[in-house]
């Protein structure tokens, strides 16, 4: 006979006593109007459904796995902290992620440019129809590593939807990143599929606020990947922000980057000038 019994139970009463609420699991159809896309919606603890909230997406589309948390996490890349500033913060797995079906994952093959973004956009628009307090006319996006590439990609290729991006340690051009990883998803020989998804090649398209962040000693993605985008943006006469973290490795930006990210989205999505950090007690 099969016997099932709980081995342990998490006690979250102290979190709940502080006003913490778990993110909502939300499902909506993707780009094809048929396939379910699953994600999370995080709200501030002082949430008021009568207000309008800018939306920020945390992206890590990979590929190679599912990335939206399936287990209890009180803290995921500071989604909840960002929400406390007065944002709705979301994360969704789009087509190209793993463990759904071969066809679902193969959307990304020789097509990392896609980044699941058409599904993410459809999902957020569906969420906003159900929850009108989600203002999808003010959407920002942030990510690190592949997410850094994808968040920059979002404002370059979908500027009508994504209005600002914070991109950390991005592998912005797959022709210069780890060969084994890139050939796994983009194939060999190197062809147009590499060029089409390159933020270096597409840098001239920038029309939205962008903050690029890089760790000086990144030993996962060469910092030159970010600097190539910087060079292309300068040549294209584009305005942007660059933050280099001395001594940092592959990072979302460490404590200094957290400050910069919070301020960046407050400025560009709320149109508010945040206080100086060194004056906050």
Spell out what each predicted region is.
Residues 1-281:
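Serine-hydrolase catalytic core recognition
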């Amino acid at each position: 006979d099969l016997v099932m019994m709980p081995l342990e139970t998490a006690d979250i009463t102290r979190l709940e006593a502080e006003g913490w609420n778990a993110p909502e699991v939300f499902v909506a159809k993707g780009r094809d109007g048929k396939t379910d896309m699953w994600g999370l919606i995080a709200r501030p603890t002082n949430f008021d459904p009568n207000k309008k909230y800018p939306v920020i997406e945390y992206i890590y589309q990979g590929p190679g796995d599912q990335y939206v948390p399936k287990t209890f996490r009180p803290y995921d890349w500071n989604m909840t902290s960002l929400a406390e500033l007065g944002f709705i913060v979301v994360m969704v797995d789009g087509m190209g992620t793993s463990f759904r079906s071969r066809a679902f994952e193969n959307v990304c093959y020789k097509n990392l440019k896609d980044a699941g973004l058409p599904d993410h956009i459809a999902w957020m628009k569906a969420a906003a129809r159900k929850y009108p307090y989600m203002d999808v006319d003010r959407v920002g996006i942030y990510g690190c590593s592949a997410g850094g590439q994808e968040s920059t990609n979002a404002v370059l290729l979908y500027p009508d939807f994504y209005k600002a991006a914070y991109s950390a340690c991005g592998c912005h051009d797959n022709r210069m990143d780890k060969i084994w990883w890139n050939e796994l998803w983009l194939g060999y020989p190197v062809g147009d599929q590499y060029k089409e998804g390159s933020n270096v090649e597409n840098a001239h398209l920038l029309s939205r606020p962008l903050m690029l962040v890089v760790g000086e000693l990144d030993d996962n993605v060469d910092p030159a990947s970010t600097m190539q985008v910087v060079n292309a943006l300068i040549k294209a006469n584009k305005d942007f922000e660059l933050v280099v973290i001395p001594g940092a490795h592959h990072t979302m930006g460490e404590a200094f980057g957290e400050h910069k990210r919070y301020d960046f989205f407050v400025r560009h999505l709320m149109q508010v000038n945040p206080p100086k950090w060194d004056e906050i007690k």
